[in-house]
Curated annotation (Swiss-Prot):
One Gene Ontology term, aspect cellular component: cytoplasm
Source species: Deinococcus geothermalis (strain DSM 11300 / CIP 105573 / AG-3a)
GO biological process: 'de novo' IMP biosynthetic process
This enzyme's EC code(s): 6.3.5.3, 3.5.1.2
Catalytic residues as annotated in Swiss-Prot or TrEMBL: 87 (nucleophile), 195, 197
GO molecular function: ATP binding; glutaminase activity; phosphoribosylformylglycinamidine synthase activity
Family annotation (HAMAP family): PurQ
Disulfide bonds: none
InterPro entries according to UniProt: Class_I_gatase-like, PRibForGlyAmidine_synth_PurQ
UniProt name for this protein: Phosphoribosylformylglycinamidine synthase subunit PurQ
Residue ranges of every copy of the Glutamine amidotransferase type-1 domain listed in the record: 2-222
Amino acid sequence: MRTAVIQFPGSNCDADALHAARLTLDPDAGFVWHTETALPRGTELVFLPGGFSYGDHLRSGAIAARSPIMAAVKAHAERGGFVLGVCNGFQVLTEAGLLPGALSRNRDLHFRCAPVHLRVENAQTVFTRAYQPGQILEIPIAHGEGNYYADPETIARLEAEGRVVFRYVDNPNGSLNDIAGIVNERGNVLGMMPHPERAVEALLGSEDGRGIFESLKGALVQ
């Protein structure tokens, strides 16, 4: 269950991601710096954490998506390895072409930091098998550019193929179709704006994020 948490300059949720990974998946999970050109041998899950990589210069995730480690992340995904991108990590995945669409400024142009409710739209992915279809989760968000956009054809394809896995119950940012998280065609790459790593312990107010890691653990064990 080897897990690698990628660190970019400006990442600020990397410690949270590492803690959640060690707590739920891999006690030996570790960091990988963005200048590395290879993942640790045996890596099964790559975790792209939230933050403000490279200070969000140009666009959120734009520079991080072109950092040296991302070639290895792309190759890992192409081999069927699991990739989880949260918040800025989701932005990096879209910029890198691993997921379609883009994340733009929130509808009200304000930074939003609060617990939100999500509905599980697809409980048949490797990331969501621990949930029930339609289950409502409480997971926090913390972003200023979480407004998901894609062209109409892409949105229609995502919906038709069941690749919208999480949807906001009360849309906080203007995302088209209330989209909070999507997977790639193969189903091994998940990008989402809410922070499941901040919802793995009751002490933090919610354990609803644990299902993602439990689902992955089940997939990795198989």
